[in-house]
């Protein structure tokens, strides 16, 4: 948590998990993570972007994941939107890097304009977990030094 993530599929995974965590405990999501990984085909953006109504129904019937219609639709739509960003910027990570650094409100506005089901808390936690904003670990935490050695985007200002 807080380490930089540069792989697009892993970034997508974090976004989907953050979206699904909304209103629930992280423990619930972590217990279902394996199911999410299988259900969303290892969060392969290209594959999820091709999901059909049949795939949506499959996901909504999968007791191993969060079966919320808005969250399932958001995962599929956001995969399609990330594909568009990959075409325009080369990768989702490159799109994030192209906008860095922004303050939290600016990131939230950008995500709201670009994606669906991305409220302020979801965006903040996504950016925190992937190393785009500081605060995942206190400086006194042993993990903080490990995070810093990986040069997360927030440390490169």
Language model segments and positions:
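HhH-family (HhH-GPD) DNA N-glycosylase catalytic core used in base-excision repair
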Residues: 1-157
